[in-house]
């Protein structure tokens, strides 16, 4: 039994409780700061557009700042709050959010919902990127060219709320998975660059390479049509029969074989 299963059995043996977001969080609208308010240093801030372009799921520092005078007029998010973009050009991106894990308060722009709560911020943020939440947000979104979810309507969103210890264990598992995914992506990117380098080196024209048609270096033989191979031709062992599915799916588990006599006449 995994640690997560042990915690669930101990702390919520009758199942996880589901609650409305409005019952566990206070949801407010963002302020009215704009990109023209940005300055080199000052009060950290998040603009809703940056949630789509610059932030991942979590952040402990911002990319931009505003002056203290400007910040006095803005809406504030506190550590552990979640900032959600509620305006988007498409339904898939709407309600993308970032958990603020920094130590200070931050100013937040309009077109956002600030979710203040006492749960595990990373757990809620992971949940807000699940298919379960996506199904609910689709019902709340409205608009044509620009999609919007009114912050007040987020109160009705249903959220599974296990005990905090369970939330923490779930976050640990998802963090590890995210890290492994990032490492795999980096490895694949490096391999792709390596492949492209060698491909370019091989194909680059030089005095040591020549170009030939595929027909000059390969022999092509048409495979037999279905009528050429019948069940009575198959044997339990011998020469493997290569099927279309092997080429399509890359699965080389051979089902059929023919003996040497049949192989020689094909």
Regions found by a protein language model. Name each.
Residues 47, 62, 68-131, 243-245, ...:
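A short beta-sheet element
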């Amino acid at each position: 039994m995994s640690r997560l299963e042990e915690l669930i059995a101990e702390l919520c043996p009758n199942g996880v409780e589901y609650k409305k977001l409005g019952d566990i969080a206070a949801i407010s609208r963002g302020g009215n700061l704009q990109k023209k308010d940005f300055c080199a240093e000052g009060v950290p801030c998040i603009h809703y557009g940056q949630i789509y372009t610059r932030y991942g799921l979590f952040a402990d520092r911002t990319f931009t700042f505003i002056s203290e005078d400007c910040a006095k007029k803005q809406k504030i998010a506190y550590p552990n709050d979640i900032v959600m973009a509620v305006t988007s050009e498409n339904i898939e991106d709407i309600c993308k959010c970032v958990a603020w894990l920094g130590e200070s308060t931050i100013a937040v722009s309009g077109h956002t919902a600030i979710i203040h709560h006492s749960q595990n911020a990373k757990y809620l943020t992971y949940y807000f990127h699940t298919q379960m939440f996506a199904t609910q947000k689709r019902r709340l979104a409205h608009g044509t060219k620009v999609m919007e979810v009114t912050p007040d309507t987020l109160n009705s969103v249903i959220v599974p709320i296990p005990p905090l210890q369970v939330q923490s264990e779930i976050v640990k598992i998802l963090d590890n998975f995210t890290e492994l995914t990032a490492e795999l992506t980096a490895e694949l990117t490096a391999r792709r660059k390596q492949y492209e380098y060698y491909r370019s080196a091989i194909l680059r024209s030089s005095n040591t390479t020549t170009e030939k048609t595929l027909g000059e270096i390969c022999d092509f033989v048409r495979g037999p049509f279905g009528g050429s191979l019948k069940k009575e031709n198959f044997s339990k062992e011998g020469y493997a029969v290569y099927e279309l599915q092997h080429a399509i799916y890359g699965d080389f588990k051979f089902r059929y074989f023919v003996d040497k006599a049949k192989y020689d006449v094909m």
